[in-house]
């Protein structure tokens, strides 16, 4: 009786666009997951050789270590301006601006608004963890009301610091953006939806459409002072009511 022939079927493998280098992010941080999702989308679309990543100041400033694509660092808040310049000079490239909440909505608010209003053909991935992570846990534009941080030890007081800024809703008031969606990475279901949104944002560039914006609610256990599992739950309990998930525009 002939021996049975065994076959192997690969059901999961590391994305080609994702480096094998161990990342520097804290345990429970969502950046590593988001990097993987971005790499998967790049591979699926076959655009690794065409992709340029712009990473400004923040926890993600070393993102170029983990994604096997061309990369460029930008000054704090200036990633959309740098991405705009690259895209206009190289319109055939897929340009991704990867930013955090302090970078995108504080020092970089002007660049964010005007790049979106011009309809620049770039893809912005906005990681919202409601805090300044890299610099030690200070209050960010997205910090929730009453949330305690290093610079709001008694909780964010709207009378003094204003309310959390909802980036997706703000950009949805503009006419030019073609895709705006808010996702999360705190559960398997949420991660799958985020993967689809990132792929759509990149696909829009491949099809030479306009500005795409993907906001991702992400965990920062170190900055929040809680355990990773608690951080994932906190997104659903505290952040989602303030930053509702869903698509605001797709055209």
Predicted segments with their positions:
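Active-site-proximal loop->helix
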Residues: 109-114, 134-148
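Thiamine diphosphate
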Residues: 1-133, 196-200
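Flexible, low-complexity linker and terminal segments
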Residues: 1-11, 15, 20-21, 206-251
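Glycine-rich beta-alpha junction loops
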Residues: 57-59, 129-131, 184-187, 216-223
């Amino acid at each position: 009786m002939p021996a049975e022939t065994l076959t192997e079927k690969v059901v999961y493998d590391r994305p080609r666009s994702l480096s094998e280098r161990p990342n520097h992010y804290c345990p429970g941080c969502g950046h590593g997951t988001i990097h993987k999702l971005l790499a998967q989308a790049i591979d699926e679309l076959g655009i690794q050789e065409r992709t340029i990543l712009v990473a400004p100041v923040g926890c993600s400033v070393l993102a170029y270590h983990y994604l096997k694509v061309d990369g460029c660092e930008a000054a704090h808040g200036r990633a959309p301006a740098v991405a705009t310049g690259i895209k206009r000079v190289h319109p055939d490239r897929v340009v991704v601006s990867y930013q955090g909440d302090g970078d995108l909505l504080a020092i970089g608010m002007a660049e964010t608004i005007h790049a979106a209003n011009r309809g620049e053909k770039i893809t912005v991935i906005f990681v919202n963890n409601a805090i300044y992570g890299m610099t030690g846990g200070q209050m960010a534009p997205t910090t929730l009301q009453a949330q305690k941080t290093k610079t709001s030890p008694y909780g964010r007081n709207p009378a003094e610091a204003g309310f959390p800024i909802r980036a997706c809703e703000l950009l949805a008031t503009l006419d030019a953006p073609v895709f705006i969606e808010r996702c999360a990475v705190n559960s398997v279901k949420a991660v799958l939806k985020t993967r689809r949104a990132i792929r759509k944002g990149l696909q829009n560039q491949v099809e030479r459409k306009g500005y795409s914006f993907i906001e991702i609610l992400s965990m920062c256990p170190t900055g929040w002072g809680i355990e990773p599992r608690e951080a994932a739950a906190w997104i659903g309990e505290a952040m989602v009511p303030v930053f509702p998930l869903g698509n605001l525009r797709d055209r």
